[in-house]
Amino acid sequence: MIQPNLSGSANGHARSYYAASAGSLPGYPSLEGQPSADVCVIGGGFTGVNTAIELARRGLSVILLEARRIGWGASGRNGGQLIRGIGHEVTGFARYVGQEGVKYLEQAGIDSVEVVRQRISEHAIDCDLRWGFCELANTPAQFAAFQAEQDSLVRLGYRHPTRLVAPQDMQQVVASSVYAGGLVDMGLSLIHISEPTRP
């Protein structure tokens, strides 16, 4: 487990557990002159870094610009959840994008986790990775939605184990009995968010 040095500086990042426990981060040169590249990616968060990697793999020359530090913005300030989805129930978007659009959003969420999983593996990134995540239901209606979510994952061919947790069993999973149930997904994780954007 990565141990924080909470008395130290935030390495040029916003103060957080992740910045305090990241150790020293390398500096990068400022842009000078008039460099030329096939593509200029602006923003060094997870999306920008991944875009630059993918383009370079396809043989394009890439310049990656970041105003502060790699991983400084939203990518360096989240809670470290490596989870599928967009923070909302995607079924609510059906009236805008139709059922095929909802299916696409669900698959995109799954694929995004797989991309990060591949990057962590191929670059041997030490990010305190621990597979297994439990979504928590505050109401019986949310727990029922988890049941529908699990069914949807099966239809999408999701390859990781999932398990519904009944309300009476939540104490065993999260040491609390206040929740109305949960959905454990072994394909999701928490990560140390400062590490995946290191060189």
Task: Give the predicted meaning of each segment.
Residues 1-39:
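Extreme N-terminal leader/targeting segments of oxidoreductases
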Residues 37-64:
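N-terminal Rossmann-like FAD-binding beta1-loop-alpha1 element of flavoenzymes
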Residues 189-198:
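Residue-level detector of conserved catalytic or cofactor/ligand-binding positions
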